[in-house]
């Protein structure tokens, strides 16, 4: 697949549109709201390589070619986290992929794989030794074919209501 490029700050709104589509696909409901405005602002800041922390977010996209306003066909977005070093991870640099989505008009063209491969290369160039993600049922086969597998039991807690 050709046409994969690094996302720019002016892609922020489209990255958030694709993120909303990803949540719709995962949860079966559309959830617009103020989070989108905040997400656009955060994405712009993190994609600006001139600002501190601009290298913590990796984002790769494919531009859409359908008629209408400029839009993205697909994206893969992740971040680098620095932790204490460990025996198999002496640099302590880990990656997390948190947003992979292909607009339904472009599915089946290999864009999710291509953007995710570009993101994995970006992680490797930064000394990341392990990358994690949470796969939807529909995308699990894609990630397994790329070499992802179970690492440990992932547990989460929602602290939004904790005072």
Language-model segments: what does each one mean?
Residues 116, 123-135:
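Conserved GNAT acetyl-CoA-binding A-motif
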Residues 80-86, 90, 132-138, 144, ...:
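Conserved catalytic-core motifs of GNAT/GCN5-like acyltransferases
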Residues 59-61, 70-80, 96, 101:
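Conserved beta-strand in the GNAT
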Residues 20-47:
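Conserved GNAT-fold acetyl-CoA-binding loop/helix
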Residues 45-61, 96:
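A short helix-loop-beta-strand connector motif used in the catalytic cores of GNAT acetyltransferases and
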């Amino acid at each position: 697949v050709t046409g994969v490029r690094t996302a720019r700050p002016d892609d922020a709104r489209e990255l958030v549109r694709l993120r909303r589509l990803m949540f719709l696909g995962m949860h079966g409901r559309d959830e617009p709201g103020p989070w989108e405005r905040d997400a656009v602002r955060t994405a712009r800041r993190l994609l600006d390589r001139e600002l501190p922390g601009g290298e913590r977010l990796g984002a790769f996209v494919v531009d859409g070619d359908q008629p209408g306003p400029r839009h993205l066909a697909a994206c893969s977005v992740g971040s680098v986290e620095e932790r204490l070093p460990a025996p198999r991870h002496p640099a302590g640099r880990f990656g997390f992929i948190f947003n992979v989505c292909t607009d339904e008009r472009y599915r089946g063209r290999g864009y999710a794989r291509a953007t995710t491969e570009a993101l994995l290369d970006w992680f490797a160039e930064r000394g990341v030794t392990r990358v994690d993600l949470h796969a939807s049922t529909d995308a699990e086969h894609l990630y397994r074919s790329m070499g992802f597998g179970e690492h440990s039991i992932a547990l989460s807690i929602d602290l939004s209501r904790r005072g």
